[in-house]
Amino acid sequence: MVTFTSEASRSRSKKVCVIGAGPAGLVSARELRKEGHKVVVLEQNEDVGGQWFYQPNVEEEDPLGRSSGSINGELKVHSSIYSSLRLTSPREIMGYSDFPFLAKKGRDMRRFPGHKELWLYLKDFSEAFGLREMIRFNVRVEFVGEKEEEDDVKKWIVRSREKFSGKVMEEIFDAVVVATGHYSHPRLPSIKGMDSWKRKQIHSHVYRVPDPFRNEVVVVVGNSMSGQDISMELVEVAKEVHLSAKTLDISSGLSKVISKHPNLLIHPQIESLEDDGKVIFVDGSWVVADTILYCTGYSYKFPFLESKGRIEVDDDRVGPLFEHTFPPCLSPSLSFVGIPRKLIGFPFFEAQAKWIAQVLSGKSSLPSPDQMLQSVDEFYRSRDLAGVPKHNTHDIADFTYCDKYADYVGFPHLEDWRKLLCLSALNNSQENLETYRDSWDDHELLQEALQSSHFTNFNS
């Protein structure tokens, strides 16, 4: 186990609550403790991993993942991982800066391993750095709100409930870091007839295995990676799989899959759902379906957070957040890790965690609230001018932004090999959707990665 000797003075040490023990929460806990802060991590599951802690039993969850009838708007099941899920990026690019995601004998050694292997990596990480001692498992956060200020010092009330005993605990913290992820609460489309359609409708949040759909006619809504993966799995058992996409301008990789499987058909978006089971598409074609499976993504939700309107989720735009991390009017005592999407997650979470920890200890400072708000407004305008829908505000897909962010804390830029391996996997998936995880042509890049200090320093 690695231990840390902090140089931060005790007067700078803060009592910090981290909500969530997934990839973002774990690295946040580590970086906060490095800076001398006293850290408590609250995790609703019985182990680390967040999304990567697989939950096979979804019988008690609403099929569409609606949380309206649950306590405090929470879901019963956090993870949306399905049984066969494999990583869409090679393991070499996914590790934290000082803890590479190595293949280990006796485990899943593939470059694109299954979800269990990433969960085991996170367990290894938490054990290597002694993080478990900071985590309270089976504890769900029900309320986070400001405490009345004393001497102009902002503090936070955190109320949580133990899963089995039902015991409620209320604590005061100097700061709260929200690291709850954003792949749990389904984002559902609005389709005419959806509420009255009598046949089976589920969201991919509760999809686990293909067997329940054997010999069915299934309509899969959404052409994302999960929509494609699940469709390719369903064609082996379902009578027909009809994939409904926003555009019929599909990748050559998906086109190859469709030509290979005569029971997999592509359609445009859905116009309406009819009482007799018909699913009518916008081009006038239709099919009578047994099941509609929505692979339509997820929404940001923080049902426990009472911010008095200073942090809001508007069509999946969480804001205002300076650099997707600090709410200007509540910083630095409230922060978020893991909001951005479509980037190499673990190194970015690590950079966020370092920045938050340093700001709380006084090693780094933030602009004024007005300056941060101005920066957020400028970012929103740039997204609007680029034609980016509001619900894609946090889809970054930009290595330059990641490098700029790292400069806030002197965190190393993403290595060239990491960027190129990411792009190589993405391009390969576009061309060879069924085989890209097991067949690739980036061997020279792979060797460059394995000979880099990211791997050699760790192995030495």
UniProtKB/Swiss-Prot annotation:
<comment type="function">
    <text>Catalyzes the conversion of methylthioalkyl glucosinolates of any chain length into methylsulfinylalkyl glucosinolates.</text>
</comment>
<keyword id="KW-0503">Monooxygenase</keyword>
<dbReference type="InterPro" id="IPR036188">
    <property type="entry name" value="FAD/NAD-bd_sf"/>
</dbReference>
<dbReference type="InterPro" id="IPR000960">
    <property type="entry name" value="Flavin_mOase"/>
</dbReference>
<protein>
    <recommendedName>
        <fullName>Flavin-containing monooxygenase FMO GS-OX-like 9</fullName>
        <ecNumber>1.8.-.-</ecNumber>
    </recommendedName>
</protein>
<dbReference type="GO" id="GO:0050661">
    <property type="term" value="F:NADP binding"/>
</dbReference>
<dbReference type="InterPro" id="IPR020946">
    <property type="entry name" value="Flavin_mOase-like"/>
</dbReference>
<keyword id="KW-0521">NADP</keyword>
<keyword id="KW-0274">FAD</keyword>
<feature type="binding site">
    <location>
        <begin position="20"/>
        <end position="25"/>
    </location>
    <ligand>
        <name>FAD</name>
    </ligand>
</feature>
<comment type="similarity">
    <text>Belongs to the FMO family.</text>
</comment>
<dbReference type="GO" id="GO:0004499">
    <property type="term" value="F:N,N-dimethylaniline monooxygenase activity"/>
</dbReference>
<dbReference type="Pfam" id="PF00743">
    <property type="entry name" value="FMO-like"/>
</dbReference>
<keyword id="KW-0560">Oxidoreductase</keyword>
<dbReference type="GO" id="GO:0050660">
    <property type="term" value="F:flavin adenine dinucleotide binding"/>
</dbReference>
<dbReference type="InterPro" id="IPR050346">
    <property type="entry name" value="FMO-like"/>
</dbReference>
<keyword id="KW-0285">Flavoprotein</keyword>
<feature type="binding site">
    <location>
        <begin position="222"/>
        <end position="227"/>
    </location>
    <ligand>
        <name>NADP(+)</name>
    </ligand>
</feature>
